[in-house]
Amino acid sequence: MSDNVSQMHTPQGKKLLRRILLFSLILLLVLGGCALYFFRDSINTDAMRRYFKYLNVTETASTGHFSFDAHSGNRYAGLGDGLALASVSGVTVLDANGAEQASLQIQMSLPELRVGKDAALCFDAGGTSLCTVSRRKGTILQATSERAILDADISPDDCVCYSTSESGYRSVLYVYNAAGTKTYRWLSSSRYLPVCTVSTGAKYLAAAALGQQEGMFQSSVVLFDTTQDEPLRELPLGDELIFDLEFLSDDTLLAIGETTASWLKLDGTVLGRYSYADAYLKDFDDGGSGFLTLCLNMYKAGSRYSVVTLGADGTERGSLFIGEEILDFSAAGKYIAVLTASDLRIYDETLTLYASTDNVAAATDVIQRADGSAILISGGSGSLFIP
């Protein structure tokens, strides 16, 4: 009888044990979720993602190692998990393992490189060649201008614009959609429009205009709706030489000038301005998530460099003096990589040190990635630094 009683109660005991284990598991998940929420600022989720993403990356592994022909005129940019390269002989896109995804051979004297979501834009500054190559679709666009290409840009969704001139016109602006189809052209016989940018979906085109007012140099941004024949409006910028324009969103524009950076709404509202004061602008990068990074120097030559990060209202988020020459710097996500002859340092957007390494060999370029890792370029190779 006792054996029968024991056998009858065993299944219920197992059910109770399963319930206890299930309850404990749910409790652990809830407590873990609460911990992640309340301590989300101190837990580095990027580090966790990097751990699993690069778990098998070693010095002998192919992942994170790139090889190419070295040249002083090469230009580099991150594209997806891989690398885009523009050289005097063309453009190449490599995947995360260093394998070629796409390439196009074109001769260039001064190659320039921009990247969008899936495509790399390459053009010969002062030359006549321009192309876009997609890591998924290969060559999308190949164009040859009548005269020198002054500037070109690619949007986050791979739309393209460029500025040139043609017989009878001081400036001609072209816009292409992400499929490489020409969707807009603007011709001006009276104005110089040497700098341009295009918004997502190729909806808006913006160009910096050079002019005079009462004998004084003046610049402005001419805004175009690509569905209309006439310019939408003009945004004055005063006596500022504009180096670059970028759409930060469909209704916000960033203008990088010789002495000032300006954030503008498309209706003309000034969101913020930042003056470099007595410093000289050496370089800039708007690849950070919601912030602009400037590299400034107190002198035209010398090593009194500083790095400044700015929010979209022009206020400083961080400022840091670097007591040696900055060879290169790059921003992506919430990180900034600063390369000097002695080391590589990665900072967050407040310029708090996040990671560093002195194993930079003869590195000349750095590409920051949004997950906190960085690609160091040295000669004809690139290697991944994982904090």
Predicted regions and their residues:
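Structural motif
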Residues: 37-41, 90-92, 128-132, 168-174, ...
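Repeated scaffold domains used in trafficking and secretory/extracellular systems
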Residues: 19, 65-77, 106-118, 146-156, ...
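Hydrophobic membrane-insertion alpha-helices, especially the h-region
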Residues: 19-37
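A short beta-strand motif characteristic of beta-propeller blades
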Residues: 54-68, 97-105, 137-144, 181-187, ...
